[in-house]
Amino acid sequence: MELQPADSLKLIQDIIRQRKQKYEENGFFLIFWSVLICLSGIIQFVMLATDYYPRYSWIGWGVLMPLGFFISFFSKMKEGARNRKEKKRTDPLDWLWLMAGLGAISSFCLPFSNWKNYEIAMLVIYLPFSFVSLAIALHLRVSLWVVTSIMGIVLTYSVLFFHYGIALPLLCAVLACLLFLVPGIQFYTNYKKQRHVQ
């Protein structure tokens, strides 16, 4: 069976629409992670700026990131079980998020290494997330997310040229807003609008 160009274009558009709908349904997770990262960054900045137990300023990250991981992990496990039951395929783009997340987890070992350079941790954490966001935004053709992803890449690379000092955790919060919060809100509002239409 041969497909006509119009049929193949329609098929491609349907696949993109289905993936976009999946991200709209999961817009909550983008918002959820952005809030966790923003809270962690703000807590660390306040503790460093006020000199309130600065040695333990990592505590927000140490509590909120594992909490977010377990909540996401178990909800994705339930979703995977439901997809297997309904014989749906999993989105291969989810593996990109997983790989970026594993890179972020590995960066928590940097303070215990000989580098002790938090700018390297910023690059290890946010460059993969920025490029994954950009790849998915380009794939889904979401122009706002493309712009915020490019801004995230530029800001992440800026740690090589500017010394942020104790404001580095605030940069994490800004990057979380650009990479996760802005597209998450856009996806979530689109999803709510579609549910009200149906």
Residue ranges and their predicted role:
Residues 132-198:
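Terminal transmembrane helical module of multi-pass membrane proteins
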Residues 36-43, 67, 106, 129-132, ...:
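Membrane-embedded alpha-helical transmembrane segments of multi-pass integral membrane proteins
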